[in-house]
Amino acid sequence: MHVIIPARYASTRLPGKPLLDIAGKPMIQHVYERARQSGAESVTVATDDERIRQACERFGAPVCMTGAQHRSGTERIGEAIVRLNIRPDDVVINVQGDEPVIAPALIRRVGEALARQTAASVATASVSIDSDDEYRSPNVVKVVCDKNGHALYFTRAAVPHARGSDTLPATALRHIGVYAYRAGFVGRYVSMPPSPLEDVEQLEQLRVLWHGERILVCQVPIGEAPKLSIDTPADLARAREQWKALTAV
């Protein structure tokens, strides 16, 4: 099992996001340290940015430099897999660089789920939504699954819709952006044309479903789900405040 953390500097809403300081460390360092605790055989940061490379090398993270043309983290990982000579049958886990408190157990859980599952090309995770604000936020990605735990759709919309009721649906699930793939599948993914849905929702995983591949979704306990995914300046401010509270205990 290998973890690759794709990192780019040019975030639209938070430029330089991987290097933003949280509790005296760049965000990417928190993610790397969590990934190291998962028991993965290797943990590598994949980036095209020299500033990110230099920051990672200062705290000892291996870095794979990639091209700047990639449209998604998975495409960047595809190049890194080739450069790192990872075997086609090996499980590769994509840990997003904006999850500074991702649980090592969650990384391991998703990787092991794919290793056991031959019917799916990808594994990811979800958690029950417990607030109406989260349910209705376009910054929170929702997932709908079939009875076997395979994804039917991912969206930023509030789904499933409870017709005739204002009550939060008990089946509402928040997608957690960690992915496990077999290395050989990533090469196929990169060669697949992007789907119209992927472009509309700006969700790279929709390419997998559009082309008829299965995504296994592991539903995890609320306590294991990351609480500090950082996409906006408000998220960053909240993360810094929560970190202060954690260290003050």
Q: Where do the language-model regions lie?
A:
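Conserved core of the sugar-phosphate nucleotidyltransferase
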Residues: 103-195
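Short, structured coil segments at secondary-structure junctions
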Residues: 39, 59-60, 211
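A conserved hydrophobic position in a structured secondary element of the catalytic/binding core
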Residues: 47-48, 102, 181, 231
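Short phosphate-binding loop-to-helix
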Residues: 50-112
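N-terminal glycine-rich phosphate-binding loop and ensuing alpha1 helix
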Residues: 1-47
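Conserved alpha/beta core of the MobA/IspD/sugar-nucleotide pyrophosphorylase nucleotidyltransferase superfamily
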Residues: 168-249
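Short, high-confidence coil segments that cap the C-terminus of an alpha-helix
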Residues: 40, 88-89, 117-120, 213
